[in-house]
UniProtKB/Swiss-Prot annotation:
Protein species of origin: Saccharomyces cerevisiae (strain ATCC 204508 / S288c)
Protein name as catalogued: NGG1-interacting factor 3
Family statement: Belongs to the GTP cyclohydrolase I type 2/NIF3 family.
UniProt KW Mitochondrion keyword: yes
Originating gene: NIF3
Subcellular location(s) of the protein: Mitochondrion
Coarse class of the protein's main subcellular location: mitochondrion
Quaternary state and interactors: May interact with NGG1.
């Protein structure tokens, strides 16, 4: 049975998303954001008019997540990362599992919206969530975006964050806070200090970027003690460590996934939508 909703219902959901994460914030120079699969219909029934749109939130739209949406009778998947990336010139489901998933979702009438860098850049978006998680939202002297969005005057609208604490925090405490807010049992840390000395290593200024921070960190204009991101190249990690800096990397999607449960779910529920967070979505890398 088709899960397709009316155009009016889908438009309402898109308005709810863009209310918090406007499309103009997305980095269109490379990112593929917005409504990537539109299965809405012009036909309206009494049941349609009274029904809530059921939304599944996920970071990555994989085959297992798509099946989860089908099984849960969801109408729309909001996938943080762009599902169609880079652009497709043809569909070949026999050689590309993403193409197979797209065809399946269309057959079931499930639409897909991907906000990605619009959420990265928004005030109150994923980067501000990461900043709050460093010390429970307390002790922040100042914070601003490392790379602002063109045309915006608010210095908290943009990619990445610089944050300075009122009072130093030990690396040991920051690592504990990061693992708690990201819901991960481990992170990777590069530091000249041995782990036994992390309680003595004080952190006051931090560069933060969800996902991959390498490009955004090039916009830094102030010196920092700590670089905190999802992933960074080996040579960059080595460079910062040799310069006496500390690096925390957590795997790309681990810096984004908890935001769906902690922030986005509640915002969309308050807008009148039924929202569930995927249980199948997970970082593709595990420790063996």
């Amino acid at each position: 049975m088709s899960r397709a909703i009316t155009r009016a219902q889908l438009d309402k959901l898109v308005r709810s998303i863009t209310k918090f994460y406007p499309q103009k914030y997305a980095d269109k120079s490379w990112d593929n954001t917005g409504l990537l699969i539109d299965c809405s219909t012009a036909q309206v029934t009494t049941a349609d008019a009274n029904a809530k749109t059921k939304v599944l939130l996920t970071v990555d739209l994989t085959k297992s997540v798509a099946q989860e949406a089908v099984d849960a009778n969801c109408n729309v998947i909001v996938a943080y990362h762009p599902f169609i990336f880079p652009s497709w010139n043809r569909l070949s489901p026999h050689t590309n599992p993403q193409h197979e998933t797209a065809i399946k979702l269309i057959q079931y009438g499930i639409s897909v919206y991907c906000p990605h860098t619009a959420v990265d850049a928004a005030r109150g978006g994923v980067n501000d969530w990461l900043v709050r998680g460093l010390n429970n939202g307390e002790n922040v002297a100042k914070s601003y975006a490392l790379e602002t969005v063109s045309g915006e005057t608010d210095d908290l609208i943009g990619y990445g964050r610089f944050v300075e604490f009122n009072k130093d925090i030990s690396l040991e405490q920051i690592v504990k806070n990061v693992k708690r807010v990201l819901r991960v049992p481990y992170v990777q840390v590069a530091s000249l200090a041995a782990p036994s000395a992390w309680n003595q290593l004080k952190i006051k200024k931090v560069a933060v970027c969800a996902g991959s921070g390498s490009g955004v960190f090039k916009q830094l204009k102030e010196d920092v003690d700590l670089y905190y991101t999802g992933e960074m190249s080996h040579h960059e990690v080595l460079k910062w460590k040799e310069m006496g800096k500390t690096v925390i990397v957590c795997n790309h999607s681990n810096t984004e996934r908890g935001f769906l449960q902690d922030v986005m779910k509640g915002l969309l529920q308050d807008e009148g939508h039924e929202v569930v967070v995927s249980k199948m979505d997970c970082d593709p890398l595990t420790v063996a």
